């Protein structure tokens, strides 16, 4: 069943299942007392490739937002100057985040290069996530009739939490254990992004949205980014102490 079509009691069931899944994920992530360091470059998952996939996700979002900004200017329908500015910030942050993840991938290929020296870039994914939350907060949504939008907001909150932790990990000392919150929010972001993508894909197949739908393209971006996030978390667990 599409999240778009949920109503009444089925909405309650969905939120109960979502809460249970979040609780189970939190328990599983937090019960481990200590993880390995976040950036152990002995990757078990071709993490350089996963970083490039994540970079592609950010770049797709950058292009998607550029097109959206252009269309808004052409039609003079953008909501406000503040909305336009935040969209530009999100667009810029998406592009710089794409470059940043390329640098992450290079670091896992070339041990003589360390992306952690890019001190300003480490905050770009976090800035992107915050900008997206500011954008969605400008639209009123209902917990009962806008389940897919609520899921998107939860995804963005998890994104802020994860990329804050990711930036924090780049400041950690060598051999310092990765934070349990990093693993937790990495898993939550990955799982919710996958569910959100499936929902948008089902909307497309049911012909309730177009291929060029803004949120549909964003779901593709989120899926590619969550590929990077998921294998980042998996790499920490694989090297667990």
What positions do the PLM features span?
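Juxtamembrane "helix-exit" motif on the non-cytosolic side of transmembrane helices
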Residues: 1, 63-76, 133-145, 198-208
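N-terminal topogenic module of multi-pass integral membrane proteins
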Residues: 1-90
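Membrane-interface helix-boundary motifs at transmembrane edges
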Residues: 34-46, 106-120, 170-180
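Alpha-helical transmembrane segments and their immediate juxtamembrane interface regions
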Residues: 93-110, 228-239
């Amino acid at each position: 069943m599409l999240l778009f079509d949920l109503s009444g009691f089925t909405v309650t069931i969905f939120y109960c299942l979502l809460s249970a899944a979040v609780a189970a994920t939190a328990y599983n992530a937090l019960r481990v007392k200590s993880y390995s360091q976040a950036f152990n470059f002995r990757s078990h998952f071709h993490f350089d490739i996963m970083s490039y996939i994540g970079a592609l996700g950010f770049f797709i979002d950058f292009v998607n937002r550029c097109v959206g900004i252009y269309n808004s200017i052409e039609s003079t329908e953008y909501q406000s100057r503040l909305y336009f500015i935040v969209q530009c910030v999100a667009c810029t942050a998406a592009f710089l985040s794409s470059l940043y993840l390329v640098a992450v991938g290079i670091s896992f290929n070339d041990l003589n290069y360390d992306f952690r020296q890019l001190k300003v870039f480490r905050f770009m994914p976090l800035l992107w996530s915050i900008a997206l939350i500011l954008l969605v907060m400008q639209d009123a949504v209902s917990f009962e009739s806008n389940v897919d939008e609520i899921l998107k907001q939860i995804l963005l909150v998890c994104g802020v939490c994860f990329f804050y932790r990711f930036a924090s990990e780049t400041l950690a000392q060598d051999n310092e254990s990765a934070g349990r919150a990093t693993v937790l929010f990495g898993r939550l972001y990955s799982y919710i992004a996958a569910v959100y993508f499936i929902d948008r894909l089902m909307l497309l197949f049911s012909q309730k949205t177009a291929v060029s739908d803004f949120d549909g393209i964003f779901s593709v971006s989120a899926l590619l980014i969550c590929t990077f996030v998921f294998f980042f978390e998996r790499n920490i667990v694989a090297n667990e102490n």
